[in-house]
Every structure is written in C-alpha cells, then in structure tokens.
Amino acid sequence: DSESHALNAYNHLLIWPLGEPDKVQVVDPDPRDGVEGSLEFRQKLEAAIGQPYYKIEGLAVVPSDKGDGLILFGVREQGNSHDDFAYVRRVIGARYAMTDSDNIEFIEDLHDVYAFDPAEYEGVNHECGLSSLEYDPYHARLYLVTSFETEQGSEEVIGGYLWVLSLADFHAGKSPTLVTHEDGRVLEFEHKAEGLAVLDRERLFVVYDNDRNHEL
C-alpha cells in the first residue's frame, strides 16, 4: 500500500555524516503527518518506475553532467507483485542538493537514467537482474553487478557478472564493458554476487548472498 507507513521498517533511506551515525536522518520523510519514514520517497520511486512492485538493489552517488550531485538507484525486479515480475538492469536517479540540516533534497523528479541488456553479450548464459552499482572516484567510472539464481533441471544455478563503464559513457547512455579474465573468458562469479565496494585504486570487494543455499 503506497499510502501506508506499514513498510517503513523495510523501506527507509537514511543519511548521516561520515563517522557520525548518531546523527542519522530519514531522507524525504512524509510531510503530511510528520512520521519519520520514507513514504514520500517510496511514492516518488513508484511513480518513476511505473510498476506496483519493484526491488531496489544498488545505490550510488556520482557527479551529474551538470556539475552537481546525482543519486542513483538500481532496479533489479519490477512487475505486478513479488511472484509476477521481470528481472531488469535499470537505473533511476535524480539530481540533489544538501540542505542546511545535512539532508538530501531532490531538485528534480526521479527518472530513468540508464539501462542495458546482458543478453546482447556473448558469454552471458543466464537471465540476470541488477544487484549492485558503485561509483569509482579514483578512475571516474561506474561498476555494475548482475546476478542470477535459477534452476536447470533439478540443479540450482547461481552466479553473477561484473560490468564497468566510464562516467562519461554512463551519461551518454553507452553500453558497459563485460569484465573478463586476462585470457578473454567472461568473469562469472561462482556465487550470487549481491554487493560491491571500491576499496582503493586497485581493489574491489564483492559480497556474496546465496538466498537458497548458505554454504559457501
């Protein structure tokens, strides 16, 4: 129910100054009743996505093509309900400004920013959805992670792929590059890759989360 605060515990967008978690704030709280939940923000997401059901997996902040900040949300699933959906690789976002109280204020409507189709790439053998995106400030590029969890016969098949593109190509809507091994083979994660972090100029950290099998 997009008019209810019942899902606040599962659908918060929070912000706090680095190293000061005691100053946490809810982003875009509902102004109608003063409840500290992100109902207003969820309604903006639903309007941008255009579907009653969606799953957000990925959050990044990048410089916009206008010189200010652009906050990005990765969409993994969208459809009518949790059991009637399609996997997508879609990114929506909006430019923002910081308020005097160190919160985020959107200065434009949330809208489609980027999308791509892994099925167009040789070596991608599974339908997958977006599971993470992360900005690399050292090299001005964006990493995207897609993952899959399916069955072939009676056997469960899980894994993921890593993609990269420059910030300029991202703003231009160009296709990402599929990351490969040095010998040209597609890099396919052996577990369900669900998160990525840029540690420094040369290292990435990938998080696995196998929903159906917790044995790594």
Give names to the regions the model predicted.
Residues D1-L216:
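Sequence/structural signature of beta-propeller domains
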